[in-house]
Amino acid sequence: MLQGYSSVVQALLGTFFTWAMTAAGAALVFIFSSGQRRILDGSLGFAAGVMLAASYWSLLAPAVEMATSSGGFGAFAFFPVAVGFTLGAAFVYLADLLMPHLGATEDPQTALALNLDPALMKKSDPRDPTSLLFPESELSIRIGSTGLLSDKRENGEVYQRKKVAATDLAEGVAPSGSMHGSSGQPGGSSWRRIALLILAITIHNIPEGLAVGVGFGAVEKTASATFESARNLAIGIGIQNFPEGLAVSLPLRGAGFSTWKAFWYGQLSGMVEPLAGVFGAFAVVLAEPILPYALAFAAGAMVYVVMDDIIPEAQISGNGKLASWASILGFVVMMSLDVGLG
């Protein structure tokens, strides 16, 4: 993120930084055990606050200013921002709905690696070997918008998206040690599971990469769309990606993957961001009138991910107060970066 280069190069540098932060978070799998849930919940809460602040000061505020200064909307200057914001949220929501049709719910071992439900584990029966696959302290993680664990209500009843039922565990899951050979390598059908995992993570990271690319593509289009603002957005997304890398690698390690393989797939979750960032920068450079829509689209996608995934995940394991105060701290830190250094 160096001044004096084109917006596309800036976007590439910015998203390489966010990818590096994902890898740094995933590398913590070499240090932390899979039972240290408080650390992850606090980090996720902090990331949620950072992303909410970045969505407004680095994306929505420039979008509103561009729509207002264009003069083409008059009293309806809010319209392109509202449309873009709604479309961004809808993009993540629809991508989430498509995951079951791509086979993400058909293989229980995929869910087992990423969804270790504390409620199910607390009710484990010592007489049932399938209930003792993982200790109660094991992590229960979702991967962004397409994650495998989500406490929500549908028609008044709590359900968990893409949840592994107890019958799935009994019928289709072997103990974690049998998933891999003695060298920690995945079994014969694991490459399909890995492909589904990468697909889920990729869908989640596209909006973040787009946000960085659009942010750099919008530089100097309005007074609030500055290089500093785009740089701060990349820093904020990098901060958010740090616990995300850990949220991928730690459950995989607990599910029986070797430490190096857990790290590899954890850092892989950020690989799509440079591609999405370059695409976003190219799009706004070539079609400047779409800038308000593009900025608001990125903001809507990120806010939806925060509200639908990061905040519920941070609250689900009994560390809600810690996560909430960490969110406040993250918001203040990102606001200070944008206002003080923007």
Curated annotation (Swiss-Prot):
Compartments, record wording: Cell membrane; Nucleus; Cytoplasm; Golgi apparatus
Gene Ontology cellular-component annotations: cytoplasm; Golgi apparatus; nucleus; plasma membrane
Keywords: Cell membrane, Cytoplasm, Golgi apparatus, Ion transport, Membrane, Nucleus, Transmembrane, Transmembrane helix, Transport, Zinc, Zinc transport
Conditions for induction: Transcriptionally up-regulated by zinc. Up-regulated during lactation.
Tissue: Highly expressed in the testes and portions of the digestive system including the stomach, ileum and cecum. In contrast, expressed at very low levels in liver, duodenum, jejunum, and colon.
Any one GO molecular function term: zinc ion transmembrane transporter activity
Presence of keyword Membrane: yes
Membrane disposition: Multi-pass membrane protein
Major location category of this protein: membrane
Pfam families in alphabetical order: Zip (PF02535)
Reaction equation(s) it catalyzes: Zn(2+)(in) = Zn(2+)(out); Cu(2+)(in) = Cu(2+)(out)
A biological process term (GO) from this entry: zinc ion import across plasma membrane
Transmembrane segments: 12-32, 44-64, 72-92, 194-214, 263-285, 290-307, 322-342
Family from the record: Belongs to the ZIP transporter (TC 2.A.5) family.
Function description: Zinc importer that regulates cytosolic zinc concentration either via zinc influx from the extracellular compartment or efflux from intracellular organelles such as Golgi apparatus. May transport copper ions as well. The transport mechanism remains to be elucidated.
UniProt-recorded name of the protein: Zinc transporter ZIP11
Organism: Mus musculus (Mouse)
